[in-house]
Every structure is written in C-alpha cells, then in structure tokens.
C-alpha cells in the first residue's frame, strides 16, 4: 500500500514538473473552475474513472458473498 501511494506521489511530481510547458485548459465541474494543463485534466479523469471501476468491482464481490447459495447455509441438526 505504501509503495502504491509512493508511486502515485512520484508520478504526480513528474506531471507537475512536465506541466510547466503545456497549454492550460479551463475545466468546469459545476461551481468549481480549475485551470490546469490539458494532460493533467485527462489524467485526473482517467484515474477517477479507474477508481470508480475498482469500487464497482468490489461492490459486486461483496454482493456475491452476501448472496450465497441456499444449500450451503442449511445446517441439519440431529
């Protein structure tokens, strides 16, 4: 987990250093207006979509665990 966070921070620093020469794009998220380099905005939207996909997969896995087959839950006591 620490490696993943560290690599994301390192990648973010590379993006910030590389963004000094990129053209700026104004992006509006409702009331929030963000002025950022174009590829940074594309990266943010990509990673947000990736994170939403991971959350949906985990939600489906948790639903499957809750809905086990009825035969496995029946215990016959004698």
From Swiss-Prot:
Species in which this protein is naturally found: Magnetospirillum gryphiswaldense (strain DSM 6361 / JCM 21280 / NBRC 15271 / MSR-1)
Keyword Signal (UniProt): yes
Signal peptide feature range: 1-22
Membrane topology: Single-pass membrane protein
Biological role stated in the UniProt entry: Involved in magnetite crystal maturation, but not in magnetosome vesicle tubulation or formation. One of 7 genes (mamLQBIEMO) able to induce magnetosome membrane biogenesis; coexpression of mamLQRBIEMO in a deletion of the 17 gene mamAB operon restores magnetosome vesicle formation but not magnetite biosynthesis.
Oxidoreductase among keywords: no
GO cellular component: magnetosome membrane
Lumenal topological domain: 23-38
Database matches in NCBIfam families: MamL (NF040988)
Effect in UniProt of substituting residue 67 to Y: Approximately wild-type magnetite crystals, wild-type protein localization
Compartments it resides in: Magnetosome membrane
Official protein name in the record: Magnetosome protein MamL
Induction: Part of the probable 17 gene mamAB operon.
Additional notes on this entry: This bacteria makes up to 60 cubo-octahedral magnetosomes of about 45 nm in diameter which contain membrane-bound crystals of magnetite (Fe(3)O(4)).
UniProt keyword list: Biomineralization, Magnetosome, Membrane, Signal, Transmembrane, Transmembrane helix
Listed transmembrane segments: 39-59
UniProt similarity note: Belongs to the magnetosome MamL family.
């Amino acid at each position: 987990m620490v490696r993943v966070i560290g690599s994301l921070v390192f990648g973010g620093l590379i993006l910030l250093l590389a963004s000094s020469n990129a053209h700026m794009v104004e992006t509006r998220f409702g009331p929030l207006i963000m002025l950022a380099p174009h590829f940074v905005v594309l990266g943010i939207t990509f990673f947000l979509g990736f994170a939403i996909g991971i959350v949906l997969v985990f939600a489906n896995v948790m639903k499957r665990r809750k809905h086990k087959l009825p035969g496995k839950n029946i215990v016959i006591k004698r």
